[in-house]
Structures are given as structure tokens and as C-alpha cells.
Amino acid sequence: MKKIVLLALCTLLIGPCLSCAQQKGGESQGGNDTSAEEREEAKTDSLSILVAGDLMQHSPQINAARSGNGYDYKECFRLVKPEISAADLAIANFEVTLGGPPYKGYPCFSAPDEYLRDIIDAGFDILTTGNNHCLDSHQKGLERTIMMMDSLKVPHLGTYKDAAERERNYPLLVEKNGFRIALLNFTYATNGLRVKEPNIVNYIDTVQIAGDIEKAKGMSPDLIIALPHWGIEYALKPAKPDKDLADWLFSRGVDHIIGGHPHVLQPMERRNATAENGGNVLVYSLGNYLSNQYKDNTVGGGMVRLDFVKEGGKVKLTKCGYMLTYCSRPQNSGKRNYRIVPVEMDDELNQQDKNIRNKFVNTATKLFEKYNVDFGRY
């Protein structure tokens, strides 16, 4: 996990530091006629953000990860770890709970704590928890998941122990490479399970979201990014409500939208690519990143990467694109564990895996060729 600054947690420290800095800067430094403001205007910063799809944990995955008296998922991420770690910020959807033993898969997920440990080891910096499985282990699971993430110091958003915690930490504001990024996450539902007080789940509620966006704007961010959990499962194209919500989010001031939930890939757009800010990214669904699902279009997913520069106080999206990944299952590979495999890595797959991967890639390629807008491979 890369070093990032959580500004909500650092506020109390900033005042004294600024006071000292102002005192030290009060005297002129010989020969330096450039003000701090002018130096800031002249500086160019860069930032890369990578977002991956759904991190699931079905029973066969739990069994495959068993190692001695614990669990080991490092092999799952070995082939994509370099790409994840190369990004300045890497984000994924944590679509399980850490409810403690007994561990279980579908329909109510509760994964071993080692799963979170190895996700962080792979290079992920931020996890979203606002999804339809966040209450699978009920109140205990929601609170324990938050506790484990806090104990491992991984920033997260979407679910909260109480209103005070949400007020402190949401929207999630992070600082990296001179950029301030405000993140939003919300879900369409929680599989019929009701959140118990004082816990909070961020649901899709436009009145609430509008207020959250305004709060984000008040944080003076360079970017506002929404990470919605929405859509229709297994549908390759977004439904009208998703399109309408995306348009509404952009109209309220969100810069980029990267969603998930359908467990399959859906189209990607770069709107207004010729604009001064480089445009606005809209990804409806990144599909499955790691799971045991095996229907044709659920066997893989993708990562998207967004590159930005900040010059003279202005932020511009300079490049964006997707990378396809295939989830190799032991049932096909003959190997012990599940593995996320970039689709270009032929040497890592046997013929059975290649056949399944090829079918997935062909469908994704045709879908993107028909519906993507100014959004190609990275």
C-alpha cells in the first residue's frame, strides 16, 4: 500500500505546522524573489489512479486459500501486483465481509482476515464497502470489517459504525502527489437486509448524495470521483436508471464515475475528451476481478487507469484506458489457487483456460468496439 494522506485525520495537526511554517518563512531568503504562490503555479504534478472490479470470495476460493492454520491469497494477485503497485492510488470494491469464522461464501459472504491482508499486500490503497453484500454478516460483520480495515490502516468508504464516523470520514478525502481527491461510494441495496442503528450504509439516495457532493466541494478537491454500486446483474449494457444517475452525478459536479455490481463488463466512455480538463470518465461496470463465478461473461473483468497532471493549479486528464483480466480457477488450471491473469499472458494458462479466456475477451472486445466512447486499452 502506497503512502497517502487522509486529510480528515490530519486536520488537527495542520494548524500548528502551518503556524511554524509561516514563522520560518517570514524572513526573506537571499536571492529568492519568487513567492510561494508563484512557485506553486509553476509546478507540475502527476497522478495515476487505478480502479479494479469486484473482489468476491466464494466457498471454493476460501478452501483453495487454506494454508496450514490460516489462509494465503498472495498467489491470486501475483501476476497483477506490478500493475496495481505501479499506480499512485489503487482502488477496488471489497464485496465481502470480515465477520469472523465460520467463513462462508454465497449467498452471505464472510471471508478470512487474510483476504484483506493480501489485498493490501497486492498494492491496493483504498477499498469501497458500500455494496449489496456489506450486511451479509449483519451488524457484527459490518462493524468488524471496518475494525479490521482501520487496524490495517487501509482507507475505506461506504459503510460506517455510526453517524459521527460518517461525518468525520465521508466523503473520503485523500491527498497524493499534490492532488486532493474526494471519493464517494453508494449502493442500490443490501439484498433485503436492513441496516441496524447506529450503523450506516450509503444507499443511492439523490437527496443525500447531493448533500455529500456539496460537502465534497467544500473540501476544495482537485477531483471528485464517484464509485457507485449499481446496475443489473449480468447485463452487458447499462439500464436507463444508471444512465440517468450518471448524467445527474456529472451535472452536480462529479468529475469521474467508475461503477460495479453487474459482475460483467459494461461500456466505458470519456466524455468531452477535447475539453480543457481532458474530459470525464464514465465506466458503468468493471466486472469480476476475483471470484468463482463461471458464466461466460463473469470469468473476468478489468482495471481502468486514469492519468492526470496538475499545472498552474489546473487538473487535466491526460490518458485513460482499460486492461482486461481473466480469473483462472483451479477447476480449469489444475493449479492450487485462483489467479487474476492479464489476458495477454498466454504462458500462464493451459489450453482449457485459454479457450474460456478467449471467449470472454472476444465478447468484451465486441462490446467495447460498439459502445465505448474515446476509451480504449491502456
Please report, for each region that a protein language model flagged, where it lies by residue.
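Positively charged n-region of N-terminal signal peptides that target proteins for export
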Residues: 1-4
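Repetitive helical segments and hydrophobic/amphipathic motifs
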Residues: 11-12
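C-terminal motif of bacterial Sec signal peptides marking the signal peptidase cleavage site
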Residues: 16-19
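Acidic, metal/ion-coordinating pockets
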Residues: 21-378
